[in-house]
Amino acid sequence: MTSEQFEYHLTGKEILEKEFKTGLRGYSPEDVDEFLDMVIKDYSTFTQEIEALQAENIRLVQELDNAPLRTSTQPAPTFQAAAQPAGTTNFDILKRLSNLEKHVFGNKLDDNE
């Protein structure tokens, strides 16, 4: 998306130079100026953010265009399971679990059987 796709009605400079008509009970010029100062700051911030996002978008599109295509013939990266420490087998794990249950539950396990 480029800025040509959006229509901007005002620039920060146009907001700054805007003159307001005042009547007998018109707006306070100080209040209007203070508010417009905030609008100008926000407008400038939005413009900077849009430019930064457009630059990032261009960079990412170029990065994507330059990235090699992954085809079905290329295997997806796989994660290998962590190697078990020496001596740790399913039997050892079950034995540890049994000992832990006996320690935690004590005679309660024997009473339920």
Swiss-Prot record:
Coiled-coil annotated residue ranges, if any: 36-68
Keywords: Cell cycle, Cell division, Cell shape, Coiled coil, Cytoplasm
Matches recorded under Pfam families: DivIVA
GO cellular-component term (any): cytoplasm
InterPro entries hit by this protein: Cell_cycle_GpsB, DivIVA_domain, DivIVA_fam
Gene inactivation effect: Cells lacking this gene have increased lysozyme resistance, which is important for escape from the host innate immune response. The lysozyme resistance is OatA-independent, but is dependent on PgdA, and an increased N-deacetylation of the peptidoglycan is observed in these cells. The phenotype is suppressed by the concomitant deletion of gpsB and pbpA1.
Functional summary from the UniProt entry: Divisome component that associates with the complex late in its assembly, after the Z-ring is formed, and is dependent on DivIC and PBP2B for its recruitment to the divisome. Together with EzrA, is a key component of the system that regulates PBP1 localization during cell cycle progression. Its main role could be the removal of PBP1 from the cell pole after pole maturation is completed. Also contributes to the recruitment of PBP1 to the division complex. Not essential for septum formation.
Assembly, per entry: Forms polymers through the coiled coil domains. Interacts with PBP1, MreC and EzrA.
Similarity annotation: Belongs to the GpsB family.
Protein name according to UniProt: Cell cycle protein GpsB
Organism: Listeria monocytogenes serovar 1/2a (strain ATCC BAA-679 / EGD-e)
